[in-house]
Amino acid sequence: MPNPGLTDEQMQEAIDAYYNNGEVQIRAAEKLGLSKTTYEHRLRRARALGFRPGVQDVEIPEFPENCPDVEAFLDLQEKRFEREAEYRSAVNWFRIKIKNNLPVGINWFGDPHLGSNGCNVKQLRKDIDLIKNTDGLYGANIGDTIDGWGDRMARLYADNDVSRTTEWKLAKWFLEEAGIPWILWLFGNHDNMHSGFTKYLKAINAASIPMLDWQAKFVVEFKNGEEFRVNAAHNHKGVSWFHQLREAMNTGYDADVYMAGHHHNWALMEREGPHGKPLLYARCRGYKFHDEYADHLGFQDLQGGCSVVTVFNPVAKSTMERVRGFKSTAEGAEYLTWLRSRV
């Protein structure tokens, strides 16, 4: 209902109380039985309208405040904070549960850059077909699904035969129509160049595939209780293997697999951790070739590692056989098929 505003009598009363109580607001407020805040508001209003001790003949309407009540707003902030804390706790080392004890693999799609003239579509299609026809092989997107040029870099669309609309259609195809059994999507720097793109992906994510910005830490859990911890990021801090080793040491070797993309190169490294468990460090190259930026900086145009496959064996006879890495979808799919046939 509309605010009736202060009456002349209320404002006059506030002025009179002020002068009758030694011009001390707290005493005037107590005299009128008002809170200090309410009294100060009435006094300010009366002064603004020129009220003086005595009777006034003019009544001016008072308008309600158009901002939220402070306490109500603080209550809302508290709920938002709690929900954010709950979300962060849920996504930190979330669990992907395998309902049997057969070995499984994750095909880590390196930066796809769909729509780019340099996207190796032929190789991408081959890898997708292999995944669709290999039992136990799942897909994970390391990020940079599209070029997604934004701000000043939007001019680079002139160098490709694609529009932003077409890029988004390609991303939808990759997510929903390519037939890939996804378990994870990460958002890279290119995905975030246009703020609406990641929101669009989340909106069409009908299968509720985990979609996280930049990094995901999760556990692959098998029926027999075996667990494999994965620390995947579009890129980990630093670009050398030393940095990934240091990250592993700094985090107490909290993962079995450290995976990254971003730099359009690939590598695999395996070593034994301090607890006698194998550690796998990998970077997938991605599908963007013929990259002028890389050419200008003199980077090698690597041919392998578009995707990297990690295979997890929950029934391995040797601890060192628990995790294996492969530099291509074809190699990983072949090994996984052979391994599952022996279980």
Description of each model-found segment:
Residues I96-I106, K217-N231, G276-L279:
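Beta-strand-turn-beta hairpins that frame and shape the catalytic cleft
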Residues L49, N101, N133, L137, ...:
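Polar, enzyme-active/binding microenvironments
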Residues D111, G143-D144, G188, H234, ...:
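Active-site glycine-centered loops adjacent to acidic/histidine catalytic or metal-binding residues
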Residues I106-W108, G139-N141, W185, N231, ...:
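Residue-level marker for buried hydrophobic side chains located in beta-strands
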Residues I98-G115, C119-L124:
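An acidic-aromatic substrate-binding cleft motif
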Residues R229-N231, N235-L339:
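Conserved beta-sheet core of the metallophosphoesterase superfamily
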Residues M1-G105:
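Acidic, histidine-bearing metal-coordination/catalytic regions of metal-dependent phosphoesterases
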Residues L114-W214:
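Core catalytic region of metal-dependent phosphoesterases/phosphodiesterases
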